[in-house]
Amino acid sequence: KCVNSDVNKSDYCPLEAKLGHTLIMVDFTSRWEKPQIDWVKGRIFGDALISSTPPYHRISYLKIDNTPPHSQKYVYSKCRFKTGTKTRFEGDKVNSKCEGSDFINTIYKTWRSQINEVENSFFPKNEDAEQSLIYEYLVHVLREYSADFGSNYQSRELIIVSDLMQYSERVNFFKHCKSAAELLKPKKQQKADKCGSFEKLLKKEKSFANYINATKPNNEMLKNLNVKVLFINHGYQTRKDLYITLQDLWEDMFKYIGISNYEIVPQIDF
């Protein structure tokens, strides 16, 4: 490709093709500690981002917070510009037929500075949220045309950075992740300690089952899709049973709604 004729100058994306889209959703509904921020930054920004994302693939950052999914806007959504150097991606090299190395290097530096600005302002002051709409955000980006994350992209990767403790009016894992012993305590003292199975949740909560069946993505929405979860280990999840059973709960839900290409990467305890 030639930058001058084939690339949109405002977002660095190809004019004629949708090559790929990496959408990074980060859950800010629980408080973050510095080790968690450092771990996540090292995976979704900087050299890790550039070395894992081919040139001219779109990169988008979306925050999960108290904002309803349909009202949330991308923090950033542009394509990864070519480095102008030899990498494992053929498209990173300067096209000597129509490009100069200084020209490409100047644009790359501009693009890189924009990504650095996003990184520096991305992690807000800690605030607990009243709800955690992880599932709702997941369904939103797969279903809605406005998210620009459709199967018309040749490849799609959805990266979810979260502690996975989903709690909303319709999908409440916090309620489902308390043992019988925990439920005997006064309500204000109850904490999540162990999750029941997804199958049990479907049988026990008919409204939950109906909601999942009504909102789960269809086959077209799942084409060319890979999902990666960076599983944040928040302080209250140091209980081993909770950490393991919560991961199992999400794996079973992914399978139920049709997501087969997924990977859950747990944060190492700190």
Predicted regions and their residues:
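Von Willebrand factor
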Residues: 1-15, 18-153, 157-160
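A cross-kingdom marker for long, charged
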Residues: 8, 228-270
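VWA/integrin I-like adhesion module and closely mimicked acidic/polar interface patches used
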Residues: 165-242
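A short, charged/proline- and glycine-enriched loop
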Residues: 12-23, 153, 222-227
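Acidic/histidine-rich, surface-exposed loop or edge segments in extracytoplasmic proteins
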Residues: 16-33, 116-124, 229-235
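N-terminal post-signal-peptidase region of extra-cytosolic proteins
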Residues: 39-48, 139-143, 208-213
